[in-house]
Design a protein with these regions (language model features):
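Single conserved hydrophobic/aromatic residue that forms the stacking wall/gate
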Residues: 1-2, 219-233
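Walker A/P-loop
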Residues: 3-17
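Conserved Walker B
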Residues: 5, 99-103
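Conserved H-loop
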Residues: 6, 34, 132-134
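Conserved SF1/SF2 helicase motif Ia
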Residues: 20-40
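Inter-Walker segment of RecA-like/P-loop motor cores
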Residues: 40-93
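ASCE P-loop NTPase helicase motor core
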Residues: 48-52, 58, 102-178
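ATPase catalytic-site recognition across NTP-hydrolyzing enzymes
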Residues: 110, 161-219
Length: 233
């Protein structure tokens, strides 16, 4: 999911996780974020939402603390920072990854290498990835592949204009108080310009992420080239 700043992404996802835990027995849910404090904050919001549910909708409480909770129906929710060992060895029905673009590339790669067996072993395991962009990194690659149906993720984009109270006048005021580049990153969710780069973002925009051309070692030509074609050196 590609969300603009302050569009209610955390509230929406936390509400879904709470609903899933209350109305499904014996499910395990993991809330992971780029920082442990952020993950605990999300769990705290979920706990607050639970406390405000009608009494008839609430389950009994087995355990309740800052890092996890367990309901009487056997459902468990835990929170942690995103790392290769965060959910290793566990069995989860839902894994929620918040601000995934802000996870360093090597940690994100190690995380999926360790957690993918857990994901693939469950027939109904859900992975929810939410973030604002931060350059052309692993999250950009996953998002770009999802748009081209090259993976099984479903891209969901929430535009800033869909939020009540945000219109053209609000956009002009926000740009005046910040900058156009900051607005493009935080509210237009442009991957380019979200981090400082040596090469101008307008040039990087032309370098679209593509799969590398496959080469046949036994031959001197590439397998993706088709004749006739023009090569410019």
């Amino acid at each position: 999911m590609l969300f603009r700043s302050q569009t209610g992404k955390s509230t929406t996802c936390v509400s879904y996780l709470l609903h899933y835990a209350v109305f499904n027995d014996n499910v395990n849910i993991a809330i992971l974020a780029n920082k442990a404090s952020t993950a605990r904050d999300l769990l705290g919001r979920l706990q607050l939402a639970y406390e405000n549910l009608p009494k008839w909708m609430q389950q009994g409480i087995i355990s309740w603390n800052k890092g996890s909770l367990e309901l009487e129906n056997g459902s468990k929710i835990s929170s942690n920072s995103t790392s290769s060992s965060a959910v290793r060895g566990g069995s989860y029905n839902v894994i929620f990854l918040d601000e995934f673009a802000f996870i360093p590339n090597h940690i994100a790669d190690d995380f999926f290498a360790s957690v993918y067996p857990t994901i693939s072993s469950g027939q109904s395991t859900k992975v929810i990835i939410v973030s604002t962009p931060r350059g052309m990194n692993h999250f950009y690659r996953m998002w770009h592949d999802a748009e081209r149906n090259k993976n099984e993720y479903v891209p969901t984009d929430v535009h800033w204009s869909e939020v009540p109270g945000r219109d053209a006048a609000w956009k002009e005021q926000t740009i005046a108080n910040t900058s156009e580049q900051q607005f493009k990153v935080e509210f237009e969710c442009e991957f380019l310009g979200s981090v400082n780069t040596l090469i101008n973002p307008s040039k990087l925009k032309n370098l679209v992420y593509e799969d590398p051309i496959k080469r046949n070692r036994s031959e001197e030509h590439t397998s993706e080239l088709q004749s006739p074609c023009n090569l410019v050196c």
